[in-house]
C-alpha cells in the first residue's frame, strides 16, 4: 500500500489550533512524491471506495495519504483506522469545513505535490502518474485539474473562469444554459471548449486538483474565512498573482459523485430548496468579492437578490399551480441572501465557524 507518516500532535486536534491554519505551509522535506489530502464528513462508504481507488491505481509513486475526519458520527474514522492503517488519520473535534480541514492536512503533508481529493471522488488508473508528469513538465504550473465525470460518465464542470458580476449575471439569467456553445455565454463553465483539449484556465474545482507544494508555501494555505465554497477560487487567484499558472488536463479522469459532505449537516429551519447550501455559498461569495473586488460585493449580492425577488413575484402571479409553488424556493433564496449579508456584514467578516 502507500507509505505514510504519523499525524503526531494533530491526531485529536481541537479548535484552538485552527486560528493559525492560514500560515505559510513550508515543507520540512519531501519524503513523498504525492500527499493525497482527503476531507470527510459522514461519508464512510464513499470514503472507503475513495481510498480503495487510490490503492487500485497501482501507482509506482511514493504516496502519502492523509484523511481529515470532520467530526463524523457514522464511524468513518474507525473505518479508516481499521481498514487503512497506513493512512495518516487526523480527527477533528469539530466540523472545520473544507478549507480549514485541508489546511490541517497540509501541516502533515510531505509530498512534492499535494493532491486534493474529495471523499466522494475516485481516481482512475494512471491519473496520479499523469498528474505528476504534467506538473514536472511545466514548472510554472501551480495547480492543475482533470476531467470530472459523474458515475454515469457525464461530464461535470472541470475548469472555470473567475467569478465576476458579468459572469454571475449570465449564469443567473439562464443564458449560459441556453447557449452553452457560445464562447461568450458559456464562458464561466467553459461549456464551449473542447473537453479533450488541455488549457490554461482561471481555476479548477477542489474535488480533485494537484498543487505544487513549493507554490503553496509561497502563497499560503486556504483562507480559513471560507468555511465552504470559493476557497479554491481564492487559492487559484493568489497562485496566479504569484506568477503561477492553472491548468486543465483532460487525460486525467476522476469520477465524482458530488455534494455528499455538504448535505450531512442539518441547520437553519430546514434544508428545503437548498437553503443551507445557498446560505453557505452566499456567505463565501460575499467574502470573496469583498476580498478581491472591494465594493463590488454589494453589486453582486444586489444583482442576485433582485433576480430571485423578481422570480418569486413572477411565479406567485402565475396561473400554473406548480409554478406558484416554486415561488417559495425563490423567496427562501432571498431570505438566505439577506441573512448572508447580515452574517458577513457585507463580506467584511466571516461568521463564527462551524457555519
PLM regions with names:
Residues 53, 69-77, 94:
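A conserved acidic beta->alpha catalytic loop
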Residues 196, 202-221, 225-253:
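A short, conserved alpha-helix in the catalytic core of glycosyltransferases
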Residues 125-158:
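Conserved donor NDP-sugar-binding/catalytic core segment of glycosyltransferases
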Residues 165-201:
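Short, flexible, basic/aromatic active-site loop/helix in glycosyltransferases
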Residues 114:
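Short aromatic/hydrophobic "clamp" motif used to bind/position activated sugar donors
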Residues 17-55:
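N-proximal low-complexity "stem/linker" segments adjacent to membrane-targeting elements
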Residues 92-109:
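Glycine-rich, basic loop-to-helix element that forms the pyrophosphate-binding segment
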Residues 241-324:
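Active-site-adjacent helix/loop segment of glycosyltransferases
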Amino acid at each position: 500500500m502507500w507509505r505514510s507518516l504519523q499525524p503526531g500532535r494533530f491526531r485529536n486536534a481541537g479548535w484552538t489550533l485552527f486560528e493559525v491554519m492560514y500560515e505559510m505551509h513550508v515543507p520540512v522535506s519531501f519524503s513523498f512524491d504525492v500527499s493525497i489530502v482527503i476531507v470527510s464528513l459522514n461519508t464512510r462508504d464513499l470514503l472507503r471506495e475513495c481510498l480503495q481507488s487510490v490503492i487500485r491505481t497501482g501507482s509506482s509513486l511514493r504516496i502519502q495519504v492523509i484523511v481529515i475526519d470532520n467530526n463524523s458520527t457514522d464511524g468513518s474514522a474507525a473505518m479508516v483506522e481499521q481498514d487503512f492503517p497506513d493512512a495518516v488519520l487526523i480527527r477533528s473535534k469539530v466540523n472545520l469545513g473544507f478549507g480549514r480541514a485541508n489546511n490541517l492536512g497540509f501541516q502533515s503533508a510531505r509530498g512534492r505535490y499535494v493532491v486534493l481529493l474529495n471523499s466522494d471522488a475516485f481516481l482512475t488508473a494512471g491519473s496520479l502518474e499523469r498528474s505528476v508528469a504534467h506538473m514536472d513538465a511545466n514548472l510554472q504550473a501551480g495547480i492543475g485539474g482533470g476531467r470530472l465525470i459523474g458515475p454515469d460518465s457525464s461530464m461535470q464542470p472541470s475548469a472555470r473562469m473567475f467569478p465576476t458580476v458579468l459572469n454571475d449575471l449570465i449564469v443567473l439569467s439562464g443564458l449560459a444554459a441556453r447557449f452553452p456553445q457560445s464562447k461568450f455565454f458559456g464562458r464561466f463553465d467553459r461549456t464551449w471548449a473542447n473537453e479533450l483539449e488541455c488549457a490554461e484556465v482561471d481555476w479548477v474545482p477542489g474535488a480533485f486538483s494537484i498543487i505544487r507544494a513549493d507554490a503553496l508555501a509561497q502563497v499560503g494555505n486556504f483562507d480559513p474565512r471560507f468555511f465552504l465554497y470559493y476557497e479554491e477560487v481564492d487559492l487559484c487567484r493568489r497562485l496566479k498573482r504569484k506568477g503561477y499558472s492553472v491548468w486543465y488536463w483532460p487525460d486525467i479522469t476522476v469520477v465524482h459523485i458530488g455534494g455528499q459532505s455538504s448535505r450531512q449537516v442539518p441547520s437553519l429551519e430546514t434544508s428545503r430548496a437548498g437553503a443551507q447550501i445557498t446560505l453557505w455559498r452566499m456567505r463565501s461569495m460575499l467574502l470573496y468579492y469583498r476580498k478581491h473586488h472591494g465594493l463590488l460585493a454589494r453589486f453582486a449580492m444586489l444583482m442576485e437578490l433582485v433576480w430571485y425577488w423578481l422570480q418569486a413575484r413572477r411565479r406567485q402571479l402565475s396561473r400554473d399551480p406548480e409554478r406558484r409553488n416554486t415561488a417559495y424556493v425563490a423567496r427562501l433564496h432571498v431570505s438566505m441572501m439577506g441573512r448572508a449579508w447580515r452574517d458577513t456584514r457585507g463580506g467584511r467578516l466571516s461568521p463564527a465557524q462551524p457555519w
